Amino acid sequence: LKKKMALIFNTYPRWDRLVSCSHSVMEVNYKNLCKPNIKNKFSYAKNTINFQRVYDCLEEGCQYEGFEEPNSEEINFVTMGRLSPEKNHKNLVRAFGEYLKEYPKSKLYIIGQGPLQEEVEGEIERLGIKDRVVLTGNLLNPFTLMSKCSCFILPSVYEGQPMVLLEARIVGLPIVVSDFSSVEDSLMENGQYLIKSTQEAILEGLRAFAKGEVPTCKFDPRQYNKEAINEFEQAISK
């Protein structure tokens, strides 16, 4: 992978602009990749969001295969992403195991697949919480399930611009999110509960939601897209 990435980096002098997906990511790229012949090429523009797909999925609904719809009388946490090291699922599962000792009427839904599937399953088995953690696999329509849950949690160690946070905001979920290096560009005023990515901090975030301390904010995806397009136009016109 490093060799492949090096080949890509070597092409950078050929391009007019090197556009990152957020200001924070641009700063990281500038710090790690900048050379004299490309230092004026760095810019950024947020990704746009296909909000209509989310709305269409919510309207269509879906049938669940292999698991039941979340019980509205319980606290239901949900996360979505590839089962890979940076997503930090094992720390999430361990924290949730501790959380269940205090709030047993809760469930955790993990949407996605990936190389750590067996390890995550093994951790769930070891903790004896198979009846409280649901691994859904990949879903064509994850948003209906998300809409039936209580809170979205993203405990990642690192991210670029996590689109899943925007999708969770469109669905209207309260959000607990870790402070990965580029998180600043994904935050909204009074729009999330920020934690570290350690097991102890994730447990703190889960408890915070149970205590009513995790906020929900209004999110306008159309306005967001207008701003993202404006950023892109500015990025390529410099």
Map each language-model feature to its residues.
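Aromatic "clamp/platform" in nucleotide-sugar-dependent glycosyltransferases that forms part
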Residues: 138, 157
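A short, active-site helix/loop in glycosyltransferases that binds the activated sugar's phosphate group
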Residues: 15-44, 49-53
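A conserved mid-protein helix/loop that constitutes part of the nucleotide-sugar donor-binding site
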Residues: 75-98, 115-121
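Short hydrophobic beta-strand element within catalytic cores of glycosyltransferases
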Residues: 174-177
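Short acidic/histidine- and often glycine-rich active-site loop of Leloir-type glycosyltransferases
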Residues: 163-167, 180-194
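Nucleotide-activated donor-binding/catalytic signature segment of Leloir-type glycosyltransferases, i.e.
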Residues: 121-137
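Conserved acidic donor-binding segment of nucleotide-sugar-dependent glycosyltransferases
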Residues: 189-200, 208-212
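A charged, aromatic-enriched C-terminal amphipathic alpha-helix characteristic of glycosyltransferases
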Residues: 213-238
